[in-house]
């Protein structure tokens, strides 16, 4: 009897260590400079992996030995749109075995940056703890397989390591997402871990497993949102264990528009639909998000900021929704005509009163741009009644 293996199930999101496996293998062979203990790539190659090669095809040395299927020349994809100096500081922090804390407003790609850094440094982004109000100390340290615990008592085999403890034993990078959502007493479990680089297991006292020591290469990347509700203040002791880096919104309109286009196109194509949103619509969408986020238009006109964070990630979501509407309901309406309704839904998330601020934006910059002759903004101005709903 022949057993047929079923193909691997399709996944909505492929982890970066698999998606960029060719790039990682190429960069490991491309740069043979010094690298910190247990690092897969050199610090310089880590930065190149995150920021890309600016469209330039990198060439492997003639004597470089690479796995089959890895090309000798390769353009490294740009993955993070931001300040290169920020990424370099993050890499230096990790190389110095200091904890790294990425802070910023929601939707500024902190989690993506932490994924990319951990992937480039240790080859995996999967050793992660998601911080919530229900996160317990066990999820940062260890738990127990209670069936084995009852049968054998406290043994190393019965211990269930957390992602952090697994990273310590492997010399890898662990990630703690939204660390400030954890309760303070849970956060403080990281203090001794980051300073002493070990975890005590008192249940195994008297054995060699009573202390779990971090292998060379272990480090921790945490993220925290600055404008979120339901967060807990970090203790001064824990703050001192991290180097802080602030990840801000994308500064350039064209760069943000290109990112929104690329990310929205990818999400729509995963759904099996074509991406059919004009550049003019995307530019208007991103411009509106930037104006409302910054409290000032590109022309310098004052804008009342909503309490909702108008993040790039939210702009990608709206662009994807517009593209899906165009694909699944073709000819029903102009895609631009759907934009006001989506913006209204975004600003109402945190405070219904923000709808009035959006109408104020329409009565200000949108109207003035329409009066200056812009056809796109004229159409949007004519749709102001949508915001009265």
Which sequence ranges carry the predicted segments?
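Exposed alpha-helical structural elements
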Residues: 163, 255-259, 280, 284, ...
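Surface-exposed polar/charged interaction patches
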Residues: 29-33, 266, 295, 368, ...
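Short alpha-helical scaffolding segments that buttress acidic/His motifs in well-ordered protein cores
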Residues: 90, 285, 342-343
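AAA+ P-loop NTPase catalytic core and its hallmark functional loops
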Residues: 4-271
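Conserved AAA+ ATPase small/helical "lid" subdomain
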Residues: 84, 257, 263-337
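Charged, glycine/proline-rich intrinsically disordered loops and linkers
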Residues: 46-72, 282-299, 365-373
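C-terminal engagement/docking regions of AAA+ P-loop ATPases
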Residues: 327-389
């Amino acid at each position: 009897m022949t057993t047929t293996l079923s193909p691997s199930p399709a996944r909505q999101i492929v982890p970066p260590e698999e998606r960029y496996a060719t790039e990682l293998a190429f960069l490991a062979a491309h740069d043979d400079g010094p690298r910190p203990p247990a690092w897969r790539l050199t610090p310089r190659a880590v930065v190149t992996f995150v920021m890309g090669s600016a469209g330039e095809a990198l060439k492997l040395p003639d004597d470089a030995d690479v796995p089959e299927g890895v090309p000798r020349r390769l353009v490294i994809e740009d993955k993070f749109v931001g300040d290169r100096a920020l990424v370099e500081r993050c890499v230096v922090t990790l190389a110095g075995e200091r904890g790294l804390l990425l802070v910023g407003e929601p939707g500024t790609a902190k989690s993506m940056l932490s994924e990319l850094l951990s992937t480039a440094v240790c080859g995996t982004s999967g050793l992660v703890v998601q911080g919530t109000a229900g996160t317990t100390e066990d999820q940062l340290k260890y738990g127990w397989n209670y069936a084995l615990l009852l049968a054998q008592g406290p043994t190393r085999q019965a211990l269930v390591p957390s992602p952090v403890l697994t990273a310590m034993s492997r010399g890898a990078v662990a990630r703690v997402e939204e660390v400030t959502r954890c309760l303070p007493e849970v956060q403080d479990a990281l203090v001794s871990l980051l300073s002493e680089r070990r975890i005590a297991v008192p249940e195994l006292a008297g054995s060699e497993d009573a202390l779990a020591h971090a292998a060379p290469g272990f480090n921790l990347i945490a993220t925290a949102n600055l404008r979120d509700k339901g967060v807990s203040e970090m203790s001064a002791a824990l703050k001192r264990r991290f180097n802080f880096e602030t990840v801000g919104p994308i500064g350039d309109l064209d760069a943000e528009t290109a990112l929104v286009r690329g990310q929205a196109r990818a999400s729509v194509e995963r759904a099996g639909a074509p991406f059919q949103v004009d550049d003019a619509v995307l530019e208007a969408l991103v411009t509106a998000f930037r104006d409302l986020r910054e409290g000032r238009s590109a022309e310098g006109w004052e804008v009342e900021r909503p309490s909702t964070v108008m993040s790039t990630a939210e702009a990608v979501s709206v662009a994807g929704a517009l593209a899906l509407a165009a694909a699944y309901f073709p000819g029903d309406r102009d895609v631009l005509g759907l934009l006001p309704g989506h913006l209204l839904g975004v600003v109402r998330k945190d405070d219904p009163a923000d709808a009035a601020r959006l109408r104020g934006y329409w009565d200000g910059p949108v109207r003035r741009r329409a009066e200056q002759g812009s056809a796109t903004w004229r159409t949007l101005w004519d749709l102001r009644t949508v915001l009265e709903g």
